[in-house]
Amino acid sequence: MSHLVKMENGQSQTIQEMLGCIERYNPDHLKILESYVQDQAKNNTYDLEANLAVLKLYQFNPHMLNFDITYTILLKCLTNLPHTDFVMAKCLLLPQQMKDENVQTIIDLADILERADFTLFWQRAEVNRTMFRHISGFHDSIRKFVSHVVGITFQTIKKDLLKELLGGIEDSTLESWIKRNGWKHQGQDLVVVATQDDKIKTKNITEKIEFENVGALMAQCI
């Protein structure tokens, strides 16, 4: 859905154009930006700059604060881990937002993800599932982050453990994630995440530089 922002001169701009000028701080545009946040949740899209602009407008206009939009923005930030979007959004929260019980729950979920305690995350997510049921693709976005962590942590992993880390998924769903990440089966119980050849090999390179090679350059610096 296209969102156009009407300026005082009667002309219209896209949200991206509006965010590039001083109009981003105009509270008259907040409702359109909030609607844009809701569309991101519905359509599994993401615009960090617009979402941070909403939180900034709340800072300047605390009487316009919308907690439901705040929750959605924070949860959308979680879907973009391992990027630091959540940290940036958290830094823009007002004291009354930080004291909110649901905000604290989301912060706790973020902390759990950051320390890669994925089993606990899925347990907490199940308890609080109504909080993000309106966010399309939320679970798969988290699984994408889990896959990233698994990919840089393991060479091989037991299938049962991998299923648990990905949220207790079924075998058929596991197969799709194995294929998506380019992993392979090893026997009945193991999944090969990375072979030794896939690991980046570092090499120390020492180059011998003779004085004559830099003499002319040093002379120019004197």
Swiss-Prot record:
Keywords: Cytoplasm, Initiation factor, Protein biosynthesis
Spans through the membrane: none
One Gene Ontology term of the molecular function aspect: ribosome binding
GO cellular component entries: eukaryotic 43S preinitiation complex; eukaryotic 48S preinitiation complex; eukaryotic translation initiation factor 3 complex
Location(s) in or outside the cell: Cytoplasm
HAMAP family recorded: eIF3k (MF_03010)
Domain PCI positions: 46-208
Subunit relationships: Component of the eukaryotic translation initiation factor 3 (eIF-3) complex. The eIF-3 complex interacts with pix.
Keyword check for Protein biosynthesis: yes
Organism (species): Drosophila mojavensis (Fruit fly)
Family: Belongs to the eIF-3 subunit K family.
Keyword Signal attached: no
Function of the molecule: Component of the eukaryotic translation initiation factor 3 (eIF-3) complex, which is involved in protein synthesis of a specialized repertoire of mRNAs and, together with other initiation factors, stimulates binding of mRNA and methionyl-tRNAi to the 40S ribosome. The eIF-3 complex specifically targets and initiates translation of a subset of mRNAs involved in cell proliferation.
Highest rank taxon of the organism: Eukaryota
GO term, biological process aspect, one: formation of cytoplasmic translation initiation complex
Annotated protein name in UniProt: Eukaryotic translation initiation factor 3 subunit K
